[in-house]
Amino acid sequence: MGKRDYYEILGVTRQASEEEIKKAYRKLALKYHPDRNPGDKDSEELFKEAAEAYEVLHDAQKKRIYDTYGHEGLRGTGFSGFRGFEDIFSSFGDVFQEFFNFGFGAGGQSRTAARPGDDLLYDLSLTFEEAVFGTEKEIRLQTLTTCEECNGSGAEPGTRETVCPVCQGSGQVVQSQGFFRISATCTRCQGMGKVLVSPCKTCNGQGRTRQSKTVQVRVPAGVDTGTRLRLRGEGESGYRGGVAGDLYVRLHVNPHEFFERDGDNLYCKVSVSFAQAILGDQIEIPTLDGGRELKIQPGTQPGAVIRFSGEGVPRLRGYGRGDLFIEVEVKIPTRITPRQEEIVTEFMQIEKEKSGEKVRKWPWSKRKDREKKSMAESTREART
């Protein structure tokens, strides 16, 4: 039975990048590793098959030959795959060190004492204006910071580390399992290769202590709820001098009493009287930049939208600003004075005449007419 296609084995395309090939191999190596499948012959074969495919596809020269001539071309170079696990672990010791955090055989690399600190997440609330125009905030948080007594080393001042007596400084101990050897983390030094003769009393050998610290956060203009700001190195300090983690600030923006936001655009509503809508007017409206004049054109209809370009929210990743959209609402009064009634009635009379219709008076208009007629008759009777 002929060999399977190497790309098919790893589950990648012929255009896959080196990183994609490595990622695919890691997945298969984890799945079919002998330690996870003891005594499973099928898994052993799949493990070897994946290793052979990776050996070819991660090597630029072998990959070029394979892409051009296939398996036959590789045989011409003397490549015949791996004979057993020892060949695989010997060839890919550094790869397995990266994949599994431990090595195989005596070639495994020792771990360093330092370990990076964890990342932190902080929730920060902003006003609407702060989110739109940007601001600077000072936040205070409790976190692990570098021990000032030992300067992060974990050792009592004046003392130093010594080589671990168990692993002799390698950070690993070798365990034999069948026909291959596995290097596991040394439990005495936790893989560090060194032990403290006299741990720092302030931090108990950790190289860091929990402290309160303040951090300045620069919030750029145009952020919104859900935006995350990354502050490199402002997370937890590393263990025994390791690099610090990062601080992620998650933003929450409070709503505005007048404006609503959608992306970089702002929306609001203004109310005008029906007389202003008919005749037009000049009114003042609030904007994020201060008050400004808004001209209501004669005959403005309810629901009309007026747009002001460039008066919205500054674009977070770009130049310029969004737009401001103003919707006009026309207020209809529920109570009017007799004088207003006369004017509106006359206006309606004109409108009806223009369209050839007869004016129908409002109920309260008829009542007023009856009252006026009655008063006139009473006046005539009094005179006689």
From Swiss-Prot:
Zn(2+) 2 binds at residues 164, 167, 186, 189. A zinc finger (CR-type) spans 134-212. It holds the Pfam family DnaJ. GO terms for molecular function: ATP binding; heat shock protein binding; unfolded protein binding; zinc ion binding. One of its GO terms (biological process) is DNA replication. Residues 352-384 are annotated as: Disordered. This is Chaperone protein DnaJ. It comes from Syntrophobacter fumaroxidans (strain DSM 10017 / MPOB). The lineage of its organism: Bacteria, Pseudomonadati, Thermodesulfobacteriota, Syntrophobacteria, Syntrophobacterales. The gene is dnaJ.
